[in-house]
Regions:
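Short loop/turn segments that connect beta-strands within beta-propeller blades
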Residues: 184-187, 249-250, 298-302, 343-347, ...
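Exposed beta-sheet edge and beta->alpha loop/turn motif
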Residues: 89-128, 132
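Core segments of small alpha/beta cavity-forming domains
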Residues: 3-70, 146-188, 196-197, 204-210, ...
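A short hydrophobic beta-strand element
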Residues: 85-99, 221-227, 370-375, 429, ...
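Beta-propeller fold detector
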Residues: 130-131, 189-198, 254-262, 305-309, ...
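Conserved active-site-adjacent core of cysteine acyl-enzyme catalytic domains
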Residues: 561-664
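Conserved blade-ending motifs and adjacent loop-strand segments that build the rim/top face
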Residues: 313, 350-362, 403-423
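Surface-exposed, charged secondary-structure patches
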Residues: 61-107, 210-219
Length: 664
């Protein structure tokens, strides 16, 4: 069975040809350092861009970085052009290619490049709405990739997957989709895994729809790792899933331990399986979270045990590298008094119990610390949009030793926390303020968690090259041998008894997928969060049913839904009246709380009015807009009003930016 993953729309009029021609022209002129003034006119240079690196350049970069500085790139092979979005307003295009660059010492390096354009063509005029170019150096272990202090990885992202052994003598790292092992004691370098090298290089091997994650490395340099996404080669060729592998350094061979198949696309499988599968070689235990069920599988004894079931997104959390997990052990999301925390790397686990009559909610991990919330059922109330809510009265952070590291309680100000978003080292507390039995949105709270840097003999750090800017390297405190020996390619050995698990791919709850810069950027279970992320990446939000929820910039400047007037019936609240009126549209209801009024104009432009909550929990129905004004119906009076955008912004901000949208 062949699976295809795409979205098809048929807009009335598109200008794809003109936009693609512009992108190709811009791409060529940037490479050849031509038409500098012409390209500069399309840019918006400011402090939003880091002009000390070539790893990522964007529309805010200076023209020097757009035109590759002194790098003198030469394209290898063909440029792959991909139309990601095309509508009546803009076209999004992603180009993928390889370039060869020669550094100041004459050494040639190969880079994988992704170049993104969002372009508008209007009345014979081209507008560059967004531009982003990422590059990643392909490591090949040449002599020039080493100096007396360590390994020079070059221009790569800072968030590569890597692990250091306990003796701090060896490093296993992933670069450009390939897994490498360096042993400083012997000066040995091994390319452990590479999709192209499994059977030679061709178009299949160059497919970038897979990723590699290092799970662990021991002091004998044996490595446990995962390959997830689309399998272009091997016994699982053509499948999407995650393979768990063990590299035996002494034997120089790789053994497959398990393979979990998925019917989902690579991007979604990568997002889910990249965190929800963990294998510990020393115990032969594999933990898999599949379709809401957490399994512990003993590969040595061939035994499978269910640890927990019905785990919705709110009932568990996993660390970025997958080795830490927490889940509620009983009850529903807001009715569980116990959390079970597992360190799958060390095998340690412990539980946290709530005070009598209270419940606990898992929120996530940050730098190895666990975050959870305390819930008192007595705090249950309703939001201004009419939904029942039981917010957290306190948020606690506990370190890896299960000791309290911090706590956050705002109840003295009648403020409670609904959830916490984790982005790198930043925690964002989404909060509400209590007014009787009603909760209104209030200002977010931001907390930075700075990880203490542990002393290590191997450090992954930044350094600066005169011609190529910021680069990354592994620095070894004891230095490295001048002459490196590159080992033979490992032998692949299919598992004697490989475990295979199939994920059905049926979502039990609605999810919202954010696509930006031509790729999946994030997945959320709340539409409002997805819209805010899509704003940051100039992207789109797609629901689980493949419906467009929101698009950056794709709306008419003037629009009216032609919705009629209506009025509250006797004993009916303004919110109930609005929702009664919206029943005729037979549309899907979305909570878009936290979004801006400007973002919500797109939702109106989809053809349905939307509900906005003003101060004092008063609901109105937004029915249309112009470039300067917005029109709404107030069910309390039954009249239609038109006010300026800034006035309506003040009105909706007073209601906590609470919006209820509808799509169909």
């Amino acid at each position: 069975t062949a699976g295809y993953y795409t979205r098809l729309v048929r807009p009335k009029e598109v200008t794809t040809d003109q936009c693609l021609a512009f992108a190709k022209d811009f791409h060529t002129k940037a490479l050849n350092k031509e038409a500098t003034e012409e390209l500069t006119a399309y840019l918006e240079p400011d402090e939003k861009s880091d002009n000390t690196t070539y790893q990522t350049v964007n529309i805010h970069s200076d023209i020097t970085h757009i035109q590759w500085g002194d790098m003198k790139p030469s394209v290898i092979g063909d440029v792959e052009w991909d139309i990601k979005e095309s509508n009546t307003v803009y076209t999004s295009i992603l180009a993928k290619y390889k370039v060869s660059c020669t550094d100041e010492e004459g050494a040639e390096s190969i880079y994988n490049v992704k170049e993104f354009f969002r372009v508008r063509f209007l009345v014979d005029t081209i507008y560059l709405l967004d531009y982003n170019r990422n590059m990643e150096q392909v490591f090949d272990g040449r002599e020039s990739d080493f100096d007396e202090n360590g390994i020079i990885l070059g221009i790569i992202p800072k968030d590569i997957s890597y692990e250091i052994n306990k003796d701090q003598t060896s490093a296993a790292f992933v670069q450009a989709g390939e897994l490498w092992l360096y042993e400083s004691k012997k000066g040995n370098l091994t390319k452990v895994f590479s999709m192209p090298d499994q059977e030679g290089r061709d178009t299949r091997g160059e497919n970038d729809q897979h990723a590699v994650r290092v799970i662990g490395i021991d002091n004998k340099n044996n490595i446990t790792f995962a390959v997830y996404g689309y399998m272009a080669r091997g016994s699982h060729e053509g499948e999407v899933g995650v393979g768990i592998y063990y590299y035996d350094a002494a034997e120089n061979k790789i053994e497959e331990k398990a393979f979990i198949t998925s019917t989902k696309s690579f991007a979604i499988a990568e997002d889910e399986l990249g965190k929800m599968v963990y294998y510990n070689q020393s115990t032969s235990l594999l933990h898999v979270l599949a379709d809401g069920t957490l399994y512990r599988i003993d590969l040595k004894k061939d035994e499978k045990k269910v640890l927990a079931e019905n785990l919705t997104d709110e009932r568990y959390a996993v660390s970025d590298d997958g080795h830490l997990m927490v889940y509620q052990t009983g009850g529903k999301t807001d009715k569980s008094a116990t959390l079970h925390i597992m360190n799958l790397k060390s095998g340690e686990d412990y539980t946290i119990k709530a005070e009598d009559g209270e419940n606990l909610r898992p929120l996530g991990f940050i730098n190895g610390d666990f975050i959870y919330g305390k819930v008192n059922p007595a705090d249950t109330g309703i939001t201004v949009s009419g939904e029942e809510i039981t917010p957290m009265y306190e948020v606690q952070i506990r370190n890896s030793k299960n000791k309290e590291a911090a706590q956050y309680n705002f109840t003295e100000q009648s403020i409670y926390t609904t959830d916490v978003l984790i982005d790198g080292n930043l925690l964002t507390f989404n909060r509400v303020i209590k007014d009787g039995e009603t909760y209104n949105s209030t200002k977010q709270e931001y907390v930075t968690n700075n990880e203490e840097r542990k002393e290590s003999k191997i450090v992954f750090e930044t350094y600066v090259s005169e011609n190529t800017g910021k680069q990354m390297r592994f620095t070894f405190a004891d230095g490295v041998k001048k002459k490196q020996k590159q080992n033979e390619k490992p032998i692949y050995q299919p598992g004697k008894k490989t475990l295979t698990i199939e994920l059905k791919g049926k979502e039990k709850e609605e999810k919202y997928y954010v696509y930006g810069m031509g790729e999946l950027a994030a997945v959320y279970n709340k539409a409002g969060y997805a819209v805010q992320k899509a704003e940051q990446v100039s992207g789109v939000v797609i629901s689980s049913e493949q419906k467009y929820v929101w698009e950056k910039g794709n709306r008419d400047l003037v629009y009216s839904t032609e919705a009629g007037k209506f009025q509250c019936e006797e004993g009916e609240s303004s919110l109930d009246a609005c929702e009664r009126y919206m029943e005729q549209y037979h549309a899907q209801r979305l909570d878009l709380t936290g979004c801006s009024l400007d973002q919500m104009l797109y939702v109106i432009n989809r053809g349905c009015p939307m509900i906005a909550i003003l101060e004092s929990a008063h609901a109105v129905l937004l029915t249309g807009y112009t470039m300067t004004d917005i029109t709404y119906v107030d069910p309390s009076t039954g009249e239609s009003y038109t006010v300026g955008m800034s006035e309506m912004e003040n009105m909706t901000e007073a209601g906590g930016n609470t919006f209820i949208g509808y799509i169909r």
